[in-house]
Swiss-Prot record:
GO BP, sorted A to Z: chaperone-mediated protein complex assembly; photoreceptor cell maintenance
InterPro entries the record matches: BBS12, Cpn60/GroEL/TCP-1, GroEL-like_apical_dom_sf, GROEL-like_equatorial_sf, TCP-1-like_intermed_sf
UniProt-annotated location(s): Cell projection, Cilium
Subunit and interaction comment: Component of the chaperonin-containing T-complex (TRiC), a heterooligomeric complex of about 850 to 900 kDa that forms two stacked rings, 12 to 16 nm in diameter. Interacts with MKKS.
Protein name: Chaperonin-containing T-complex member BBS12
Superkingdom of origin organism: Eukaryota
Alphabetized UniProt keyword annotations: Cell projection, Cilium
Similarity remark: Belongs to the TCP-1 chaperonin family. BBS12 subfamily.
Amino acid sequence: MVMACRVVNKRRHMGLQQLSSFAETGRTFLGPLKSSKFIIDEECHESVLISSTVRLLESLDLTSAVGQLLNEAVQAQNNTYRTGISTLLFLVGAWSSAVEECLHLGVPISIIVSVMSEGLNFCSEEVVSLHVPVHNIFDCMDSTKTFSQLETFSVSLCPFLQVPSDTDLIEELHGLKDVASQTLTISNLSGRPLKSYELFKPQTKVEADNNTSRTLKNSLLADTCCRQSILIHSRHFNRTDNTEGVSKPDGFQEHVTATHKTYRCNDLVELAVGLSHGDHSSMKLVEEAVQLQYQNACVQQGNCTKPFMFDISRIFTCCLPGLPETSSCVCPGYITVVSVSNNPVIKELQNQPVRIVLIEGDLTENYRHLGFNKSANIKTVLDSMQLQEDSSEELWANHVLQVLIQFKVNLVLVQGNVSERLIEKCINSKRLVIGSVNGSVMQAFAEAAGAVQVAYITQVNEDCVGDGVCVTFWRSSPLDVVDRNSRIAILLKTEGINLVTAVLTNPVTAQMQIKEDRFWTCAYRLYYALKEEKVFLGGGAVEFLCLSCLHILAEQSLKKENHACSGWLHNTSSWLASSLAIYRPTVLKFLANGWQKYLSTLLYNTANYSSEFEASTYIQHHLQNATDSGSPSSYILNEYSKLNSRIFNSDISNKLEQIPRVYDVVTPKIEAWRRALDLVLLALQTDSEIITGHGHTQRNSQELTGFLFL
């Protein structure tokens, strides 16, 4: 693939330089406004359009040891959470550079590992104060509130988002981009929602309402006082409960006032919009899929006697390139594509209930289940092996067809591959056979239709056959949805089946993979938010809190070091402990620099600033104010309240009542941080090439540099 290359200095840490190089390629994927890339193959000159970190790494040369470690970390995050991958890759690069700087200053590796690990654990504990509980989502569903109503008020430079038709509203909100991914709502004690835009945005001087600010701080920080920390990795990082001040490492404290009120999110549409991060079209489909699952559960359980759980394993996608995006929708049942040659079969079956058989493995003559032992000492001698193969498969296909006729089966779902000859025979006899069906789909039809999955067609009996399945075209005019591979979309469903299919369409075939990836990212965000029953306040608040707390911690560590530097050699018996006191402030500041780079790039990518330097300067201004306040979380909430005061001075405050909040999922974000730092520290500790001594100083300049091709 044609990608950039980077000069590598062999005097420095090779593994960390490679990680920084890989991470540099994915900077444009950070944030809600992603810039797509074209990857061109040098050999065949074919190009691929990508807009996600996972697809990018698939196109890079990751054959090196560090590249394989990076790929494993990204795949682990993607396979589990389907979100947080861009954050992981960016922090890998930022923290690799931070570790390189520490090495350049002579900080011992053991100190780097220890302090950075404890620093990240500390951040994971501190961000608990920005948790928003998500409870009783389905008990408080508002049928009058729709996703489209909230989407209408989103303003963004992104082409796939709608812009309000009210030009006065656009002028009032000039410069505020992608409200759904950069806004925040906090409820005060009176319950009235207060809308506020992203924290890190240039603003004019405003006067804050002190009473409102105090109420907001009390409301959101109350949970911190009564919550015991879960992540305790060091005796230096324990937190004291039920006190006026919350204890932090080395005397770091936040003074908070206890209150019985905490902010909660109890609306599905509000939660979905807040987690969409600007991708409204995909999240709207996900929200509709959850609604269908909930309605089906209510019917099956009698008004939901048991708590409803969103089952993401029963959500499927069907991609149909070539159709307009307006054709995308969500339907109950299973939608898939079959060959156009099945058109007369479907017309024959669509007006009648169909009996179904489920085959677990392949439906071929030579298929044998896992663990099958072939009989020994059996030889077949024939003059023509081709005649043997043809006649054998023909006889087998005829036998399968006779079984289907005997039990009046017109629909066969196969988890594996299907014999082409059998498919032809079934089409002629008006029977539909579909292969490569997902195991969850098979299980859903088994539960709803009363069928039993079997490994071989010879195992089929009356008890294994299900009934009541409906087969129909997805559209009333099937020829309108024929793709370039001559396939048509059909719908399979039966009463009570717990399956939902999202039909994804796009006129540009190259963008279908992007659309499907974005759908699953939104689906997993909503899934983990509902599963964990909590989310983070979004819009950069979590990362800024980490940045601020680490800077305060570093300054306090520096003061302690200066206070005891005159006698540390005499008072300390441990070299590690004494070195820790000296280098701890430096390592913490470099760790915090990773968060600052993250926020600067995020702001730059959203086009709020002309350069990353300008964005970094603005963040530095807020950082100084937050550290001076002594309570970063209180400062964050206070800044939000100031923005509220400015917004509600406009004439459109009545319309802003419907502007959505922004949220982040908790565990996927924390795990992305942890995996990024673990990878960097692993590369640091496993790279044994340490360049020191006279032998290396005698190398010429050509030996000390090289190229890393991506």
